[in-house]
Design a protein with these regions (language model features):
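Conserved beta-strand core positions
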Residues: 4, 26-28, 54
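A structural detector for beta-sheet-dominated domains
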Residues: 7-9, 31, 59
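Short glycine-/aliphatic-rich beta-strand segments at the starts of folded cytosolic domains
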Residues: 1-7
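Short glycine-enriched loop/turn motifs at secondary-structure junctions
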Residues: 1, 31, 48-52
Length: 73
């Protein structure tokens, strides 16, 4: 599992983020405090406080991890 900080502090950034993570077959979770939500769920992402950076957990991405991180920049 790889964990990175992401900042998705606007509606457009949330839409773009969810579109990108849905292109991959891996599990993506957003974590803030005690809440963990599926990062592929736009409703789930909007339920979080997106004004602050969030932790993104990427599970089992293997060799594609660098490609994923590059696409999220």
């Amino acid at each position: 599992m790889k964990t990175v900080k992401v900042s998705i502090d606007s509606i457009e950034k949330v839409k773009e983020f969810v579109t990108i993570v849905n292109e991959y077959p891996y599990d993506f979770d957003l974590v803030t405090g005690r809440y963990v939500i599926n990062a592929k769920s736009i409703m789930g992402v909007f339920s979080l406080d997106i004004s602050k950076p969030l932790d993104l957990n990427i599970r089992d991405a293997g060799a594609q991890i660098n490609e994923i991180l590059e696409s999220l920049k």
